[in-house]
Regions:
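Generic C-terminal helix-cap and adjacent flexible tail
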Residues: 146-161
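Short linear motifs at protein or domain termini
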Residues: 1-30, 37, 154, 158
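Conserved amphipathic alpha-helical segments that form helical-bundle/coiled-coil interaction surfaces
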Residues: 24-103, 115-118, 122, 132-142, ...
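Short, 15-30-residue, compositionally biased linear elements
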Residues: 108-116
Length: 161
């Protein structure tokens, strides 16, 4: 497994990519809600300011119809940084490598809802609301999971034509 593909996405055939993406979201659901909750508990003012800035940047890029993937990745990395836990930061460096593939598979049809979900997560973290941050992240990732399933259904329908 190459360092730039630690999750093994490129090792999969096209038909297995959807399953791999679902597995990726399952892992993110195990990890990121707790990252968000810990971030709400541990983030200081400067952490929250940076998270808010990144959240706004993602929103502006989406509103302008520009590529927002790099900013989205930085947002998720900042979430981990807000925990003040280096192991979580290291794990997030690996986890975010799957985000571009997810955007590709879902044809980026979720960008506007991502902005709203990120806003809710950011507000909860900034308010020190661990439960709100946790549930906001669960909502965000569950929405992502539904979009993968929708994309898979659409691909199967196209193949059956």
């Amino acid at each position: 497994m190459a360092n730039d593909d630690p999750l093994g996405f490129r090792e999969n055939s096209e038909e297995k990519l959807f399953q791999t993406c679902l597995e990726f979201v399952d892992v993110r659901l195990m990890l990121e809600p707790e990252v968000a909750a810990m971030a709400a508990t541990n983030a200081d003012y400067a952490d929250c300011q940076k998270l808010q800035m990144l959240q706004r940047e993602v929103g502006q890029l989406v509103d302008q119809g520009k590529d927002h993937i790099a900013a989205d990745i930085e947002y998720h990395k900042q979430l981990a940084a807000c925990t003040h836990n280096q192991i979580l930061c290291n794990l997030m460096e690996i986890v975010v490598k799957g985000i571009p593939l997810f955007v590709k598979i879902t044809k980026n049809d979720f960008a506007k809802s991502t902005v709203e979900q990120h806003r809710a997560i950011t507000e909860a973290i900034s308010a020190g609301d661990a439960q709100g941050a946790r549930y906001g992240m669960i909502t965000h990732l569950n929405s992502n999971r539904k979009r993968i399933l929708k994309a898979l259904t659409e691909q199967k329908a196209t193949e059956n034509l």
